[in-house]
Swiss-Prot record:
Subcellular location: Cytoplasm
GO MF, one annotated term: translation elongation factor activity
HAMAP family documented for this protein: EF_G_EF_2_B (MF_00054_B)
PANTHER family according to UniProt: RIBOSOME-RELEASING FACTOR 2, MITOCHONDRIAL, TRANSLATION ELONGATION FACTOR G-RELATED
Job of this protein: Catalyzes the GTP-dependent ribosomal translocation step during translation elongation. During this step, the ribosome changes from the pre-translocational (PRE) to the post-translocational (POST) state as the newly formed A-site-bound peptidyl-tRNA and P-site-bound deacylated tRNA move to the P and E sites, respectively. Catalyzes the coordinated movement of the two tRNA molecules, the mRNA and conformational changes in the ribosome.
A Pfam cross-reference name: EFG_III
Positions contributing to GTP binding: 17-24, 81-85, 135-138
Species per Swiss-Prot/TrEMBL record: Desulforamulus reducens (strain ATCC BAA-1160 / DSM 100696 / MI-1) (Desulfotomaculum reducens)
Protein name (Swiss-Prot/TrEMBL): Elongation factor G
Length: 692
């Protein structure tokens, strides 16, 4: 089967936003207009095609990013709908890694919400060109220009309007296209019928002003245009479009458009903008990677003629076909039934079938090409972030970084029958989600699950019951504390067993120093000279220290931000072994850490509360009582905003408290920001409780 669409006519985009900005509705409308769905699914009534897990339909939020293919104006648009809830940032991170461009959806009333900032920062990190779509223009309090200001001030972006709304709130009836200088007015409810008219008389001046701003912004990225513009020559529509595209791809501007997806207004022009201004796979720089054999840097150009290279960005368990691995092809082509190498794990995999996904139904395709996004059936060892490539042409593509979980709960099966099923189910779920971890507590034998927040773990427990029929009791959420040291020390570790039979001998001196937070977390330096510790025993010492760091000395929490330098030691010709040096390394670390002024660290969350003016005092008082540090207070619309840093330990059950304090009118969002030392009196309580 040959390619349906040339690579230049492919768009891989993500739709990203804060919860409730209307992201899933927007995707639904795109699918409707591109002829993929015959009846529009509303999120309100739990029928949206992109939200296909039961939990999503009940909660009205998107949890997993579904990938869908649509067609518009002779282009193929692959869309990934990403979740906007902070507990699921990993899904967003994953999607952005494999996209070429994105549409950021903002609510015209709320503007830039905290989650929009997080997602925007993630997109900045990957240098993703994006369009901003200001949605919900029909809502009371809709303000397009305030949305533009917030994109500029809160996100530090350079927003440039390429459309203006005609009216707002219930008078929102169309848009003015600043490129063509025409007005598009919608006639029917489905928005498929619209007419192009002249600009309304009361908007002529405003349109001129914003068109000038647009021309100025795009002329800056093109010298020839700049000359034409300065000499007062009229620029053609085509020239303006090319210039907008160029500036958008260079991430110099963010074109801003508007609409109301729910009322079906503005979605077709959003599709036009995706095709006109967002990159094709051929517009983005070649993907970087490393050759695993030589360690040298390598790259793949987006072309069918290059060797095959793809990145698996999501694993899902499907009730019908088993394990599905979603992947993005960066170069080359792949036929179903062929073999590829998982270069990250060094294992050969057979691709059984290749499926093209449409939110929750699928079609089987014989072959994928560069730039495609599809799902493979039959990959046994592949997990999120792995590279799949041609066996003759090895490369490992740059993977993704995932944050450590910050909250954990003990979970136990209700019956013996549930016990066996629970193990299998949890391992499948942790395969799907790299921020969800499962471990067994050595002291109590309990199974501990850890994740990014209360909602994250709630949904996991819910899925256990629905998908895997496992009934489980869940303990109270616990905070993932960590430990570190505050001063540098030198310490000795000596492990000697020499009474009869083969002896053991390992002896080391190490220096421990605190590292800055936010860095690598652990660093090992070998300063052995003259072979006092033979080379083959260096790595075991490192491993011994790493193992000892897993169980901190204050309360058994993981230790972080430590640099260990091995600088002296001794060995025995006969009795020394890797095991002996591993134990010596671990002993030296424990001895040193005791003396290095160890402290307990706790996760601090950035909390943003939005409340009506009259509850402001209560909310601030409450945050202070939770050991919160108020950072700033501001206004958004007619509500007040309080930003604070609060320890996670004090935030359990906050949703209920806030509801009762503000009679249900306050909302909040929180996300993990950093770790900080626990105040001494509180740390003593935590340590005593752990040692019980």
């Amino acid at each position: 089967m040959a390619r349906q669409f040339p690579l230049e006519r492919t768009r891989n985009i993500g739709i990203m936003a804060h919860i409730d900005a209307g992201k899933t509705t927007t995707t639904e409308r795109i699918l409707f207009y591109t002829g993929r769905v015959h009846k529009i699914g509303e999120v309100h009534d739990g029928a949206a095609t992109m939200d296909w897990m039961v939990q999503e339909q009940e909660r009205g939020i998107t949890i997993t990013s579904a990938a869908t293919t649509a067609q518009w104006n002779g282009h193929r648009v692959n869309i990934i709908d990403t979740p906007g809830h902070v507990d699921f940032t990993v899904e967003v991170e994953r999607s952005l890694r494999v996209l070429d461009g994105a549409v950021a959806v903002f609510c015209s009333v709320g503007g830039v919400e905290p989650q929009s900032e997080t997602v925007w920062r993630q997109a900045d990190k990957y240098g993703v060109p994006r369009l901003a779509y200001i949605n919900k223009m029909d809502r009371v309090g809709a303000d397009f220009f305030n949305g533009m200001d917030m994109i500029k001030n809160r996100l530090g972006a350079n927003p440039v309007a390429i459309q203006l709304p005609i009216g707002s709130e219930d008078r929102f009836k169309g848009i003015v296209d600043l490129v063509t200088k025409k007005a598009i007015v919608y006639i029917d409810d489905l928005g498929t019928n619209s007419e192009t008219t002249d600009i309304p008389a009361d908007m002529v001046d405003q349109v001129e002003e914003y068109r000038e701003k647009l021309l100025e912004a795009v002329a800056e990225s093109d010298e020839e245009l700049m000359m034409k513009y300065l000499e007062g020559e009229e620029l053609t529509e085509e020239e303006i479009k090319v210039a907008i595209r160029k500036a958008t791809l260079a991430v110099k501007i963010t074109p801003v458009i508007c609409g109301s997806s729910f009322k079906n207004k503005g979605v077709q022009s959003l599709l036009d903008a995706i095709v006109d201004y967002l990159p094709a796979p051929t517009d983005v720089p070649p993907i970087q990677g490393v050759n695993p054999d030589t360690g040298t840097e390598d790259q793949r150009i987006s072309s069918d003629n290059e060797p095959f290279a793809a990145l698996a960005f999501k694993i899902m368990t499907d009730p019908y076909v088993g394990k599905l691995s979603y992947f993005r092809v960066y170069s080359g082509t792949l036929k179903s039934g062929s073999y590829v190498l998982n270069s990250t794990k060094g294992k050969k995999e057979r691709v059984g079938r290749i499926l093209q996904m449409h939110a929750n139904h699928r079609e089987e395709i014989p072959e994928v090409y560069a730039g495609d996004i599809a799902a493979a059936v039959g990959l046994k060892d592949t997990t999120t972030g792995d590279t799949l490539c041609d066996e003759k042409s090895l490369i490992i593509l740059e993977s993704m970084e995932f944050p450590d979980p910050v909250i954990h709960v003990a979970i136990e099966p209700k019956t013996k029958a549930d016990q066996d099923k629970m193990g299998v189910a949890l391992s499948k779920l942790s395969e799907e989600d790299p921020t969800f971890k499962v471990r067994t507590d050595e002291e109590t034998g309990q199974t501990i699950i850890a994740g990014m927040g209360e909602l994250h773990l709630e949904i996991i427990v819910d899925r256990l019951l629905r998908e895997f029929k496992v009934q489980a009791n869940v303990g109270r959420p616990q905070v993932a504390y960590k430990e570190t040291i505050r001063k540098a020390v030198k310490a000795e570790g000596k492990f000697v067993r020499q009474s009869g039979g083969k002896g053991q001998y390992g002896h080391v001196w190490i220096e421990l120093e605190p590292l800055e937070a936010g860095g690598p977390g652990y660093e090992f330096v070998n300063k052995i000279v003259g072979g006092v510790v033979p080379r083959e025993y260096i790595a075991p010492v490192d491993n011994g220290i790493k193992e000892a760091m897993e169980n901190g000395i204050l309360a058994g929490y993981q230790m972080v931000d430590i640099k260990a330098t091995l600088y002296d030691g001794s060995y025995h010709e006969v009795d020394s072994s890797e095991m002996a040096f591993k134990i010596a390394g671990s002993m030296a670390f424990k001895n040193g850490a005791q003396k290095a002024n160890p402290v307990l660290l706790e996760p601090i969350f950035k909390v943003e509360v939005t409340v009506p003016e009259e509850y402001m005092g209560d909310v601030i008082g409450d945050l202070n009582s939770r050991r919160g540090r108020i950072e700033e207070m501001g206004q958004r619309g007619n509500a007040r905003i309080v930003s604070a840093f609060v320890p996670l330990a004090e935030m359990f059950g906050y949703a209920t408290d806030l509801r009762s304090k503000t009679q249900g009118r306050g909302t909040y969002s929180m996300q993990h920001d950093h770790y900080e030392e626990v105040p001494k009196n509180i740390a003593e309580g935590i340590i005593a409780k752990r040692k019980g």
